[in-house]
């Protein structure tokens, strides 16, 4: 198992690795990066990661307007999800440790679901043990829909392949 961590403290990554290895008796190779753009660069260089763990608070925000922050976060995660694919499994699951202001049903969760990010941890679920569980077994699309409390008609799916034009746009 190879994991790319993007959390603002290497001690957090080390603690998660230690917990995972004791829970699942499996060795993890890992790397830590500290910026959203560094995640993209690392994935362009190395497609062999099995999981990506990102802390929403990875970078400090210069703005305190939540809408601006959410748009910034979504744009970064959208770009990361575009790069997050490997040759063995396809899409690399992204595990996002959300900030404490997030709740199930938040509008950003619908947008993240639409780009294939099914592993956001919210509220009291933001624990090392739950990060380890998602590293070991990421959520399915159906599980994410239930966890995020999303209705199907809320989701606008985004094409993974920018070269494919939807039929209704032809």
Language-model region placement:
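Long, basic/Gly/Ser/Thr-rich N-terminal segments
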Residues: 1-165
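Walker A/P-loop phosphate-binding motif and the immediately C-terminal alpha-helix
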Residues: 167-170
């Amino acid at each position: 198992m190879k994991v790319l961590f993007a959390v603002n403290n290497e001690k957090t990554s080390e603690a998660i690795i230690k917990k995972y290895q004791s829970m699942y008796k499996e060795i993890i190779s890992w790397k830590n990066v500290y910026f959203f753009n560094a995640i993209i660069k690392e994935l362009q260089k190395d497609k062999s990661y099995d999981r990506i763990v990102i802390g929403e608070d990875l970078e400090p925000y210069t703005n305190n307007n939540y809408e601006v922050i959410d748009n910034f976060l979504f744009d970064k995660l959208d770009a990361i999800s575009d790069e997050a694919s490997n040759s063995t499994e396809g899409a690399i699951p992204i595990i996002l440790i959300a900030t404490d202001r997030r709740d199930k049903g938040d509008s950003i969760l619908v947008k993240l679901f639409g780009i294939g990010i099914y592993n956001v941890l919210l509220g009291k679920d933001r624990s090392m043990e739950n990060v380890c569980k998602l590293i070991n077994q990421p959520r399915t699309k159906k599980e994410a829909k239930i966890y995020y409390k999303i209705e199907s008609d809320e989701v606008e799916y985004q094409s993974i392949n920018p070269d494919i034009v939807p039929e209704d746009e032809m």
